[in-house]
Amino acid sequence: MSGQICGIDEAGRGCLAGPLCVAGCMLAREIAGLADSKKLSEKRREELYAQITKNSRYKIVEISSAQVDEIGLSACLRSALEQILAYFMGFSRQIIYDGNATFGVRGLQTLVKADAQIAEVSAASILAKVTRDRTMYELAQRYPQYGFAQNKGYGSRAHIAAIERYGLTPFHRASYKIKSLQPSLFD
């Protein structure tokens, strides 16, 4: 652990409903068990989330589905990255974003699979995922028919079937096109 690295990752990029969450994290001390959030159980992510928030400087940016629809995913990512970069300015010597695109934001280094290699990026991955999952559990209480507690807003068969039956909620990304719901050339 360097103490000079800020890791950034996001959750909810390809979902049909719910926010895009982008987190930046600079660890104050080493935390055992950090890994890519997708490789951890929900229980373990929650445990690590508590440790990370107590032992780091962090920022989480939550972007609504409406904003994604209005300005697009890339512009939303750019905005979130700029906010995180501004927050960590002067605290971090190196800012590493998981992926291969900077979305036009200067001062970022990108690294594919950084969430599996760099503790600070793993921590950011966990912060983003837990924040987003908690929002989806709240939405599941309001819209139980969509199965948000299980699918977290991603395009599962059951979720797509619910959209076909009930339509979109205000938390769905209306700009995202679902192939199976598009009219066929032969209809």
Question: Could you say what each language-model-derived stretch is?
Answer:
Residues 1-187:
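RNase H-like, Mg2+-dependent phosphodiesterase core
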